[in-house]
């Protein structure tokens, strides 16, 4: 069939027909192991931001993930119908119910008309990555990713991309930005990435904040995984990835991301049943925070010096955030649930009473 189409039809048609057997084989494999498509989704999610900077994607990125999650759910349903593998009860766990509660809150938030108007398109655009995707991911993981072997394979995959991200950040720091990155910086990111304390590097992510937060999560996850892994090669790999994540966190210059390893170790201490590992984590947590807050160790290093500003109540950048919070407090009595999901700069008119709230930096919008 492939030979006949190649000799009698246009190249594009022949290629499409020739790929049908491979596509059917791939679908069959994914029905047997839906986790393969989940890993592909993870890979795309990790690199699509960088791809979009060099080759702008003509459709909304959320549409791509709508398609991927839709295919995954379809394959899972087919597997449930045609096999005896029924693990749906595994999805009934605490995390699923927490996400269901969060989804319900987000759905209710669709009726938030505090600005005088509803914005269903903006709400739906934010609802998917904030609530629907996490719930679907939890559902898929609970049903089909319930073996330690998958966890190790997934951590290896995650570790490889963490190393790639940290390496790209290292390249930016030591070799400089390429022409596309410089064009983006001068057009959009210079104000937030060229600051008085130095340059904030962003690897192949959308910005330094996302890069730093991702590296902080990787640092915490792989450090804890290294503590528990019994395979010495995996233990070494996890530890190297953790250090790479910590390096990425440093060069990103995102102080808010430091909260991720602090919170991660704190939660681990609460959940840990191994007192030796728990004590080690406690000493690292207290020692790290104490070093940054009460000492001048590493003050000559620009990266450590910037991290230390997180705990400096007189830091100018932190004071700006406090000023934003003071301005927002005037609105909070009127809008305790905010102005609506997705109501950001460009959505509401500058003449709207709540325009300031829509343009206020997101990391300053949570006011006690």
Language model region names:
Residues 1-81, 108-112:
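N-terminal signal-anchor transmembrane segment
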Residues 22-27, 103, 107-111, 135-137, ...:
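Alpha-helical transmembrane segments of multi-pass inner-membrane proteins
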Residues 24-34, 74-87, 139-150, 223-230, ...:
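Structural signal for the C-terminal ends of transmembrane alpha-helices
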Residues 30-42, 87-100, 151-158, 234-238:
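Membrane-interfacial loop-to-transmembrane alpha-helix junctions, especially the N-terminal start
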Residues 63-72, 94-104, 118-143, 157, ...:
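Aromatic-anchored transmembrane helix interface
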Residues 122-128, 193-208, 313, 320:
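Short aromatic-rich membrane-water interface segments that cap or initiate transmembrane helices
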Residues 167, 173-176, 252, 269-312, ...:
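A membrane-periplasm/extracellular boundary helix in multi-pass inner-membrane enzymes
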Residues 195, 298, 308-368:
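Long extracytoplasmic/lumenal interhelical loops at the membrane interface
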């Amino acid at each position: 069939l492939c030979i006949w189409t190649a000799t009698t039809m246009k190249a594009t048609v022949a290629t499409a027909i020739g790929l049908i057997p491979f596509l059917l084989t791939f679908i069959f494999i994914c029905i047997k192991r839906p986790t393969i498509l989940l890993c592909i989704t993870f890979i795309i999610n990790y690199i699509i931001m960088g791809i979009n900077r060099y080759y702008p994607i003509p459709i909304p990125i959320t549409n791509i993930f709508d398609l991927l999650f839709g295919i995954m759910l379809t394959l899972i349903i087919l597997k449930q119908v045609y096999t005896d593998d029924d693990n749906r009860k595994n999805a009934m766990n605490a995390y699923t119910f927490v996400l269901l509660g969060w989804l319900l809150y987000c759905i209710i938030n669709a009726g938030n008309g505090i600005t005088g108007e509803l914005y269903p398109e903006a709400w739906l655009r934010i609802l998917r990555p904030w609530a629907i995707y996490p719930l679907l991911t939890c559902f898929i993981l609970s049903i089909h990713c319930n073996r330690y072997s998958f966890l190790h394979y997934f951590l290896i995959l995650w570790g490889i991309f963490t190393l790639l991200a940290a390496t790209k950040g290292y390249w930016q720091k030591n070799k400089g930005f390429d022409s596309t990155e410089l064009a983006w910086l001068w057009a959009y990111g210079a104000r937030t990435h060229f600051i008085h304390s130095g340059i904030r590097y962003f690897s192949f992510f959308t910005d330094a904040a996302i890069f730093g937060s991702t590296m902080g999560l990787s640092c915490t996850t792989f450090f804890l995984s290294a503590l528990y892994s019994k395979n010495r090669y995996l233990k070494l790999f996890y530890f190297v990835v953790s250090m790479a994540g910590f390096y990425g966190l440093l060069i990103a210059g995102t102080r808010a991301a430091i909260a991720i390893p602090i919170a991660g170790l704190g939660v681990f201490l609460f959940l840990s049943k191994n007192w030796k590992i728990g004590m080690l984590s406690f000493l690292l947590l207290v020692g790290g925070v104490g070093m940054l807050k009460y000492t001048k160790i590493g003050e000559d290093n620009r990266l450590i010096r910037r991290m230390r500003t997180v705990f400096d109540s007189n830091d100018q950048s932190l004071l700006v955030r406090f000023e934003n919070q003071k301005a927002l407090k005037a609105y909070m009595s009127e809008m305790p649930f905010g102005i609506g999901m997705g109501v950001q700069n460009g959505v509401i008119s500058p003449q709207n009473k709540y325009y300031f709230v829509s343009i206020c930096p997101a990391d300053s919008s949570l006011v006690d």
